[in-house]
Amino acid sequence: MHYKLLFAAAAASLASAVSAAGVVGAAEGFAHGVTGGGSASPVYPTTTDELVSYLGDNEPRVIILDRTFDFTGTEGTETTTGCAPWGTASQCQVAINLHSWCDNYQASAPKVSVTYDKAGILPITVNSNKSIVGQGTKGVIKGKGLRVVSGAKNVIIQNIAVTDINPKYVWGGDAITVDDSDLVWIDHVTTARIGRQHIVLGTSADNRVTISYSLIDGRSDYSATCNGHHYWGVYLDGSNDMVTLKGNYFYNLSGRMPKVQGNTLLHAVNNLFHNFDGHAFEIGTGGYVLAEGNVFQDVNTVVETPISGQLFSSPDANTNQQCASVFGRSCQLNAFGNSGSMSGSDTSIISKFAGKTIAAAHPPGNIAQWTMKNAGQGK
């Protein structure tokens, strides 16, 4: 079967999103069944205050974003003393002393003056039963992120961009936060120029999450590795989490892509990891990772060592047949171009998927080309 047929549904969903007043398609993998705002009549916020109100109220909502909502300057700026753990060169991020982080963890780092935009620090609260959908390439939230927390569930974030959240400053803000939640689908989202994490799942149970066909764009003038490659990618740290990463484009990063620990079962399938000056996977205690059908192109270190968690890297055709007992198929090989290796043959992870909704996987042959054309907002 040709890839243009295998991925036709995903590609068609993005093409039609320009005019569709609502969610297109359905979540694959662990967040399968999420409905967001369902059949609620679409609303079109026109101001930042209206957007915050719609996202935070208790009504099921289909919220259509047809413009840029720029939060920069809406809460003023703060000038204070921070620190420079990675040096003071022009490409290095410096850190805000949020919750005394510099004092407690970087006491020997040089002190520096920091001036940051206060709106970026605390993301917008998204309550249960919300669909946030961008119209074409128009739906942008700038200078502030989103957070699905404190028991919120059944949330869809589709076809938007979240950008420009204090990119010079660690602790300047995250793009999307999920914590103490369930059934969250992040789809065809672009994140760019973020101070801290592009996506973070916090330490409470975040349960069922799918991140699909999204672009994590790590290009930045500032990074913790001082090389123009953003370090803080995707951090999965929940206490009872099942996460599907499918069809995403992870570009120009240097670390935490993803960092997996806590008690997190991760299915990483058919993603493109491209142009990393650093490491991709970081697997800590309580991280259970099954990776198949992914492409690693120009990635220095595919998996940081030592691995404290568990990894099944779909290492060879014979071993991959063991997936059939739970998946109903063999797992797909990963592909590597000018990249490091990925070694992990812990087949015990396969049984953890029993009874779960498992995303389909395709061979990696055309994944890179397809993903570059189709992942992210408006594609």
Curated annotation (Swiss-Prot):
Reaction it catalyzes: Eliminative cleavage of (1->4)-alpha-D-galacturonan methyl ester to give oligosaccharides with 4-deoxy-6-O-methyl-alpha-D-galact-4-enuronosyl groups at their non-reducing ends
Catalytic residues, per the record, are 256
Keyword list (alphabetical) reads:
Carbohydrate metabolism, Cell wall biogenesis/degradation, Disulfide bond, Glycoprotein, Lyase, Polysaccharide degradation, Secreted, Signal
Location (main, coarse): secreted
Glycans attached where? 129, 252
What's in the GO CC field?
Answer: extracellular region
An example of a GO molecular function for this protein is: pectate lyase activity
Keyword Disulfide bond in record: yes
* SMART domains the record matches: Amb_all
Point out the signal peptide segment: 1-20
Residues that span the membrane, as ranges = none
Top-level EC class: lyase
EC number of this enzyme = 4.2.2.10
- Gene Ontology terms: biological process: cell wall organization; pectin catabolic process
The chain's disulfide connectivity reads 83-102, 92-226, 323-331
- Determine if Repeat is one of this entry's keywords: no
Where would you find this protein in the cell? Secreted
Task: Give the protein family.
Answer: Belongs to the polysaccharide lyase 1 family.
Q: What does this protein do?
A: Pectinolytic enzymes consist of four classes of enzymes: pectin lyase, polygalacturonase, pectin methylesterase and rhamnogalacturonase. Among pectinolytic enzymes, pectin lyase is the most important in depolymerization of pectin, since it cleaves internal glycosidic bonds of highly methylated pectins.
**Protein name, UniProt field:** Probable pectin lyase B
Instruction: Please name the taxonomic classification of the source.
Output: Eukaryota, Fungi, Dikarya, Ascomycota, Pezizomycotina
| The gene coding this protein | pelB
